[in-house]
Amino acid sequence: MSDNWVVQNLQNALDTWNSKLADIWTLVTQTPETFKGGTIWKVILNIHGGMQAIGLALLVLFFVIGVMKTCGSLTEVKKPEHALRLFIRFAIAKAIVTYGLELMLAIFKISQGIVAKVMTISSITSSSRSVLPQSIITAIEGCSFFESIPLWAVTLIGGLIVTVLSFIMIMTVYGRFFKLYLYTAIAPIPLSTFAGEPTQSVGKSFLKSYSAVCLEGIIIVLSCIIFSLFASTPPVVDASKAAVTQVWTYIGELIFNMLVLVGTIKMSDRVVREMMGL
């Protein structure tokens, strides 16, 4: 690494960005069971088990509400076709509450399979890094002390923005994991609404929302792939310009590309819902 402070500041900001980008590639391929050593997952499973007992109790309540709403009288309930339909609904709803965790894990594994396929086809890995061009390093090192003063201000501002964007990006990806845990923990309660016809829309909405959270990983990976291809071609800088102009142009274009990536990752949930009509 160069001994120049301005170069070091820019490189440190890029290293932070590259580190967070590599963390994203690791996070999107992890499962809730392996995230942070599985400690959080064990607690979530315990909570899910406790919620399951509540869900089964609510199952009966929603079933009774459904019977009262859909059947006009007790005589109608006694009809074989109605009784059979109600029994099948109750059995299916109970199975969904009992095996809801397995259902949710199956949905997650399908989305992870798509993520793995996209990463394999693209051949883009976490090793794709943003690197400070040699032309920028040469221009900065060729500056005198007084010429480098405005460069300090430019690199401080640019480095700070890059660092902030790095943390915003990684926080969004961590937020996806937190949402997965939250959905898993309380799953039995919304799933119990399948027992009643008037309340089943809540259960459908829950499964759609959970599927959208799982599919966010695909949008995040695609966004990172597109950014990696952008980053492989450094911004074009006019070498005949002053060093401060070159650095400002480079940082401006770099931050613009980073803003596009961060914005897409932050809106991944909205993008999925618009694509899938969820």
Could you tell me what each predicted segment is?
Residues I44-Q52, L84-I88, I92, G175, ...:
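Alpha-helical membrane-interface segments at transmembrane helix boundaries
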Residues D23-T26, H82-R89, A116, T120, ...:
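Short amphipathic alpha-helical coupling elements at transmembrane boundaries
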Residues L58-K94, I186-Q200:
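Hydrophobic transmembrane alpha-helix segments characteristic of membrane transport
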Residues M1-L10, P80-G100, G203-V213:
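Alpha-helical transmembrane segments and their helix-start/interface "positive-inside/aromatic belt" motifs
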Residues K94-I186, C224-G277:
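Non-cytosolic segments of integral membrane proteins
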Residues M1-L58:
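Binding/recognition "hotspot" determinant
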Residues A53-I65, I157-T163, L180:
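Hydrophobic alpha-helical transmembrane segments
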